[in-house]
Amino acid sequence: MKIHVLGSSAGGGFPQWNCNCPNCAAYRQGSPHLLERTQSSIAISGDDANWVLFNASPDILQQIKSFAKFQPNPVQALRDTAIRAIFLIDAQIDHTTGLYMLREHRQPLELWCHALVHDDLVTGNPVLNVLAHYCGIHWHDVPLTQSGFAMDGVPGLHFTALPLISNAPPYSPHRDQPQPGDNVGVTVVDTQSGKTLFYAPGLGEMEAHVWAAMQAADCVLVDGTLWTDDEMITLGASGKTSRAMGHLPQSGAGGMLEWLDQLPSSTRKILIHINNTNPLLDASSPQRHELTRRGIEVSYDGMDIDL
């Protein structure tokens, strides 16, 4: 299984266009310890030729330009792409706006998402209605069953979606009232090697079924949004805690680091969806050194993971 990190930042990217937090300010002043990051998205393939795009960020065009395997093959059709399917884990703006940029597709987009996500994308944020006037979509409802599913045109991979406690977008009727399917994590299994990835960029609470999936995975690529629960409040950037926004903080009791420390030593542990305010973005910070000590990696745009 090939996994390519297209974007590693939370919504807004890094640096965020209107932000003067210590990280964004230091980046603009030329700090060598901070990398530019686009908004969260990954690509997965079982054969290195047919790919699934997980989430379509507002930065999708830049991400495609940076990833040759997503670019049109000159020996194929005039209009070509290796993206065989798109999987949306939720209906958030930073995971769906990129769909507009894919409207030139020659056939309907093969779109996989839960019915609740689909509902939000034809009502509160009706991007799918707009796309009906362009390429259109072929929607596949993502089941929340242990048996999982395969995708046509994506050989060698099997997918299982797990409901997560996180938060729906502000335009959803389920905002602050989580419903199973608003947000999902995904287990992806390479059917030849048996290797398993668990992917959950938005994880607000650790439940038994989620923890079991993480323990069974060879690699976990999980929520790294904020370092402390009150990070945004302390900076004056928001009045909400990390958990209230649907993200487990890294530090503190019951935080992501405590959970990752309990995984088998053989498990590869990687953080993604990192907010611009998070001090771990600074490679010279005590927080980054703490992650290194614990054997936890920080994803970056262009990172490749082989399982």
Language-model segments: residues:
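A short, active-site helix/loop in glycosyltransferases that binds the activated sugar's phosphate group
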Residues: 116-126
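Pre-active-site segment of Zn-dependent metallo-hydrolases
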Residues: 15-91, 97-104, 206-213
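Active-site-proximal loop/helix segment associated with metal-binding centers of metalloenzymes
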Residues: 12-39, 143-242
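Short, well-ordered alpha-helix to beta-strand connector turns
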Residues: 83, 108-109, 134, 216-218, ...
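Cap/insert and terminal regions of metallo-dependent hydrolase folds
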Residues: 181-183, 192-196, 204-302
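A short alpha->loop->secondary-structure connector
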Residues: 71-81, 105-107, 127-141, 148
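Active-site neighborhood of phospho(di)ester-bond hydrolases with catalytic His/Asp-centered motifs
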Residues: 53-57, 82-94, 113-114, 198-203, ...
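Extreme N-terminal starter segment of soluble prokaryotic enzymes
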Residues: 1-4
